[in-house]
């Protein structure tokens, strides 16, 4: 190596300068290449940035448009929000009004619950009363059924008894009229016998003087006896009795409750006993209803007449009168029973009407109370 103080050759560069120049050239070349490459890269980046700028412009326009749309939506949403706030205020006022209505409804509900509790107690009490009334109605129906059965039985028994009594009365009347006919025939025969005896005695006493008056009285007595014999025959014609205007025609239940008949019935046994006493006494003279006032029979003839008179005729009559009085008493008892049954039926109908009215009143009473509680 040559130092700084050494002599140089003339016309030749030193080597270190050449190296430095080469180094500088290399560095500059490298720098140019590097700058060119960087310029290319920058151009590419610039182109890319330009494309990005275009895209951003497009995107910015799109975003501005979207922003405008969003602003329109925001305005619409703001308007909707204001509308909803107004609706909210209105709904809040309505809610307050509803709260007031709810409170009033709660108060009315409490009142209705109290009314319902009272009405349930009333309904329970009325149900108990209804059950009792049903039991009473069933019992009354059973009694009515029994009364109807008894009524039908009594009516049938009454019809049967009235029919039997009518038949017995007819038989007794026929027997009584036959007995009366027999008695009248017997009395006529006795009268004829007494007239013969009297005429014979008068003939013995007055053989020539008084025959004509006696003969006159005898036809008169015969005419009277014939009339008396014809009287009972008028009652029976062809085996059938003629019905009297005041009679019962064989039906004792049709008779009116005449107090005179009821008063006459107990006196019949006395008259019967009196007649029996008159008949059973042989010493007394029996009463002959059809004898003439001037004619009297002998005591023996009267005793025979008393023996031949059947003592049971008056007893049959009194028995028929007693049967009539018994039938009248039965008819009165049946009428009283029928009247009692009708009174019971009317009372039941009144009770049923009262029950219906009570139920209707309860229904009408419950309706306005429920309406007042709701209002």
From Swiss-Prot:
Membrane-spanning ranges: 13-33
Family, per entry: Belongs to the GOLM family.
Coiled-coil residues: 34-198
Major localization listed first in the record, in broad terms: membrane
UniProt keyword Membrane present: yes
Region feature (Disordered): 81-102, 193-327, 342-375
Keywords assigned by UniProt, alphabetized: Coiled coil, Membrane, Signal-anchor, Transmembrane, Transmembrane helix
Segments of skewed composition (Basic and acidic residues): 193-204, 350-375
Protein localization: Membrane
CC annotations in GO: membrane
Superkingdom assignment: Eukaryota
Record topology, Cytoplasmic segments: 1-12
Lumenal topological segments: 34-375
Protein encoded by which gene: GOLM2
Keyword Transmembrane: yes
Membrane topology: Single-pass type II membrane protein
The protein, known as: Protein GOLM2
């Amino acid at each position: 190596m040559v130092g700084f103080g050494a002599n140089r050759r003339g016309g030749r560069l030193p080597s270190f300068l050449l190296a430095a120049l080469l180094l500088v050239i290399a560095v500059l070349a490298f720098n140019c290449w590097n700058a060119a490459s960087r310029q290319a890269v920058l151009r590419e980046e610039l182109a890319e940035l330009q494309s990005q700028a275009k895209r951003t412009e497009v995107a910015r326009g799109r975003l501005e448009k979207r922003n405008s749309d969003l602003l329109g939506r925001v305005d619409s949403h703001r308007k909707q929000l204001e509308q909803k706030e107004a609706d909210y205020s209105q709904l809040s006022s309505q809610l307050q009004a509803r709260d007031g209505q709810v409170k009033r409804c709660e108060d009315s509900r409490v009142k209705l619950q109290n009314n319902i509790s009272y009405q349930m107690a009333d309904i329970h009490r009325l149900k108990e009363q209804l059950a009792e009334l049903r039991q009473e109605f069933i019992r009354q129906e059973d009694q009515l059924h029994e009364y109807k059965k008894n009524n039908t039985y009594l009516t049938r028994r009454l019809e049967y008894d009235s029919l039997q009594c009518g038949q017995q009365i007819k038989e007794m009347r026929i027997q009584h009229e036959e007995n009366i006919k027999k008695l009248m025939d017997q009395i006529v025969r006795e009268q004829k016998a007494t007239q013969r005896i009297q005429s014979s005695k008068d003939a013995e006493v007055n053989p020539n003087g008084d025959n004509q008056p006696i003969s006159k009285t005898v036809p008169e007595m015969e005419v009277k006896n014939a009339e008396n014999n014809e009287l009972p025959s008028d009652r029976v014609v062809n085996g059938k009795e003629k019905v009297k205007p005041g009679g019962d025609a064989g039906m004792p239940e049709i008779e009116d409750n005449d107090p005179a008949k009821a008063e006459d019935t107990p006196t019949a046994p006395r008259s019967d006993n009196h007649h029996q006493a008159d008949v059973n006494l042989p010493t007394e003279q029996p009463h002959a209803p059809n004898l003439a006032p001037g004619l009297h029979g002998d005591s023996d003839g009267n005793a025979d007449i008393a023996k031949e008179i059947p003592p049971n005729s008056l007893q049959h009559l009194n028995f028929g009168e007693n049967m009539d009085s018994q039938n009248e008493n039965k008819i009165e008892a049946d009428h009283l029973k029928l009247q009692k049954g009708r009174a019971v039926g009317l009372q039941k109908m009144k009770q049923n009407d009262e029950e219906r009215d009570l139920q209707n009143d309860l229904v009408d009473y419950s309706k306005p109370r429920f309406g007042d509680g709701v209002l």
